[in-house]
Design a protein with these regions (language model features):
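PAPS-dependent sulfotransferase catalytic domain
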Residues: 1-155
Length: 155
């Protein structure tokens, strides 16, 4: 079964994964970046066999959310996964369900700190970061996309 570590980007997901991985996967309790591999991003585990090679569309990927989780859960082991996905459905495809989820750790960060973190991470000014976060038509980190140009983040 899956335990989700869910958050909006720049909210402390990696920090929580660092604490959990040090506690759960280290004999000494000491942190190393190698330990973070024990709590992967869910998007890495999505079964992409049925997705067109050049597809960047969340709709196509969302069709594989539940089937991928069913496949992951076949051995009945408890696994942690990082996600920035919302508990949503895209074209009727739910992100997860009770049959595949054991628990969720939901991380919430003060939005004022989130704005400054996003601005610093993407080298934006505070106003551009705020406008990006409050734009209802924007998403962060679409699957299969890498932001190499901060202009892509501009509102």
């Amino acid at each position: 079964m899956i335990i989700w570590i869910a958050s909006y980007p720049k909210s402390g997901n990696t920090w929580i994964r660092s604490l959990l991985s040090s506690y759960l996967f280290s004999e000494s309790g000491k942190f190393s970046f190698e330990l973070l591999k024990n709590i992967e991003r869910f998007s890495i585990k999505i079964d992409k066999a049925n997705i067109k090679v050049k597809s960047n569309y969340q709709t196509e990927i969302s069709k594989n959310w539940i089937p991928s989780q069913i496949k992951i859960n076949r051995d009945k082991k408890i696994r942690f996964f990082k996600t920035h996905n919302a508990m949503c459905a895209i074209n009727g495809n739910k992100f997860t369900d009770k049959q595949n989820t054991l628990a969720t750790i939901y991380i919430i960060r003060d939005p004022r700190n989130l704005v400054t973190s996003l601005a610093h991470h993407y080298q934006l000014n505070i106003n551009d970061a705020f406008n990006f976060l409050t734009n209802k038509r924007k998403i962060i980190f679409p699957i299969n996309s890498n932001y190499k140009n901060k202009k892509e983040l501009k509102p």
